[in-house]
Amino acid sequence: MIEADRLIQPQLQGQDDVIDRAMRPKLLDEYTGQDDTRAQLKVFIQAAKNREEALDHMLIYGPPGLGKTTLAMIVANEMGVNIKSTSGPVLEKAGDLAALLTNLEAGDVLFIDEIHRLSPVVEEILYPAMEDYQLDIMIGEGPAARSIKLDLPPFTLVGATTRAGALTSPLRARFGIPLRLEFYNVKDLSTIVSRSAQVMGLAIDSEGAIEIAKRSRGTPRIANRLLRRVRDYAEVKHDGAVTKKVAEHALDLLDVDGEGFDYMDRKLLLAIIDKFMGGPVGLDNLAAAIGEERETIEDVLEPFLIQQGFIQRTPRGRIATNRAYLHFGMIKPE
């Protein structure tokens, strides 16, 4: 299993959730990046408010750390309603979901993180709730059991997932607003870093923010985590202000290189280059070669490397691109 404390992992770790909450934008106008998604949401939210209706059910998907939870909270704030949050693995029984649904008020947002991990029993309860705002529940056991229908107030279900393909077709079809979040560009990430530094009361110049953004793998959660570590370095080794040079020294010390790669990324790329002559190599062989699970490679390591053009995924397996060779000062064989 991949190290739980990997500095550039996009999943939550340690105090991330508490600190991220303090830095989260509250409204769409404060939200940086994801321009297409933001523009769509503004229209959908305004239309729902004009009609005095609950917003349509929404599925937010994409790699971890890009702001799915933040967007769900922004939706609730923009609509002026309450939000109740839970996650797929927590909803073990139909009664768990029923308890949440029956406590919703008209227009409220129910946010389910990791919605692809809902159990089939819970998912069945969700279908009529999403479509007809009705809750079908069984009362009693055995021959005396009977089904009753409860009316629910109109509500908005916001589901978040890193694996949209793992959702069942019936569940996916019930979301009227699908939103895909993409990795952030350096410009948007540097804006996020500067905003977070301001919230933290940290002096940072534009070049320092850009340097952190470059090494943040297109992910705001990683950018904020690196910013906190660079702040530590700046306070101990310098005067507390973050410049480009301070950021470079701090991140080099943390073994996060100019592309945002750490030991695990370099290990994966070098395995393809050295052990499998650049590929193609199958996922199972690659997982065995670096001592990781295939899910870790698919869900954590690969997405950014593919998006940045360092790995190519083909029907025959993974291939290291010319860019991967150049990263290590090598020339790809013809």
Curated annotation (Swiss-Prot):
This is Holliday junction branch migration complex subunit RuvB. Its EC number is 3.6.4.-. It is found in: Cytoplasm. GO terms for cellular component: cytoplasm; Holliday junction resolvase complex. Residues 258-334 are annotated as: Head domain (RuvB-H). DNA binds at residues 294, 313, 318. Residues 185-255 are annotated as: Small ATPAse domain (RuvB-S).
